[in-house]
């Protein structure tokens, strides 16, 4: 006999909670919206993929998301399908979908790039490879957005071929000395931690010599620099690691298993992208299509 709560009752309770904590969105007649034509010169012509917020505006948006996520976490809706031993409710993914179907009807703070990366990629990767102490240290704080984490994967000469990365990790007792540069890192300026894939062994095939670390951004030898876009914003960052001494307790997964950690994280990224609705920062999808045809 199933011990799962009735999903319709679960959805009803979620709706009640949302009504008490968020503003409902106006109902949209999708048929009428579909019939509307794009008229040049009317409305916004912004079809940008990336936003152009100032750091102050970006931080204000992030703080709004953090406040919402803390509410959501405390009410039990942030880790619905996470295992109970990690602080979740242990429910199937169908309950997540049921909750999200209700949440989409409400005005929720816009997440931007960092929160989905932090909660959808970094936290589950820690859950997959972390020690009990690491899971306790990072999973729930990330899912409540008390802290944020980003990916430190790409390098100037290692983008699509990630396994060719050269950021070096050399063991020195109970520490690792990291040296190298990461690039195109979304959200690094507002993150407390970064999941870095490094090369710890140059004498084995490139996929086998990688090791993963959780790198604290307030650490000596860790520097974050924004990459300014021509449009004025700075969605991406460079992260420089210069003799950054990282404790072995921050290593995620076994030595030499960084490739497996990276693939797992990228797998979560694909899952997250496929389950999310198509969206971008600028105008409607119809505007993008119209601009492409113009």
Please give the residue ranges for each predicted region.
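Amphipathic, small/basic residue-rich leader segments at the start of a protein or domain
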Residues: 1-117, 134-137, 141, 148, ...
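A structural signal for short hydrophobic beta-strand segments in well-ordered beta-sheet cores
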Residues: 167-170
């Amino acid at each position: 006999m199933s011990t799962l709560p009735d999903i319709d009752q679960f959805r009803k309770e979620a709706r009640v909670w949302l009504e008490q904590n968020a503003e409902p969105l106006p109902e949209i007649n999708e048929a009428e919206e579909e019939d509307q034509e794009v008229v040049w010169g009317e409305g916004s012509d912004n079809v940008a993929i990336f936003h152009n917020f100032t750091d102050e505006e970006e931080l204000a948006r992030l703080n709004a998301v953090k406040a919402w996520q803390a509410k959501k976490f405390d009410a039990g809706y942030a880790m619905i399908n996470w295992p109970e031993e990690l602080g979740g409710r242990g429910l199937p993914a169908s309950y997540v979908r049921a909750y999200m179907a209700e949440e989409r009807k409400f005005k929720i703070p816009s997440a931007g790039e960092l929160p989905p990366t932090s909660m959808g990629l970094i936290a589950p990767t820690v859950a997959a490879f972390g020690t009990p102490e690491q899971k306790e240290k990072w999973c729930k704080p990330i899912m409540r957005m008390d802290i944020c984490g980003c990916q430190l994967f790409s390098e100037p000469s290692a983008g699509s071929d990630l396994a060719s990365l050269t950021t070096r990790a050399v063991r020195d007792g109970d520490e690792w000395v990291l040296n190298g540069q990461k690039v195109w890192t979304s959200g690094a300026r507002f993150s407390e931690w970064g999941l870095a894939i490094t090369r710890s062994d140059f004498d084995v095939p490139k996929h086998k010599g990688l090791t993963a670390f959780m790198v604290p951004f307030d650490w000596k030898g860790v520097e974050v620099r924004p990459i300014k876009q021509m449009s004025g914003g700075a969605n991406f960052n460079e992260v420089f690691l210069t003799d950054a001494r990282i404790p072995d307790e921050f290593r995620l997964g076994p030595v030499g298993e960084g490739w497996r950690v990276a693939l797992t994280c990228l797998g979560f990224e694909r899952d997250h992208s496929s389950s999310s609705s198509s969206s971008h920062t600028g105008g409607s999808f119809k505007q993008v299509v119209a601009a492409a045809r113009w």
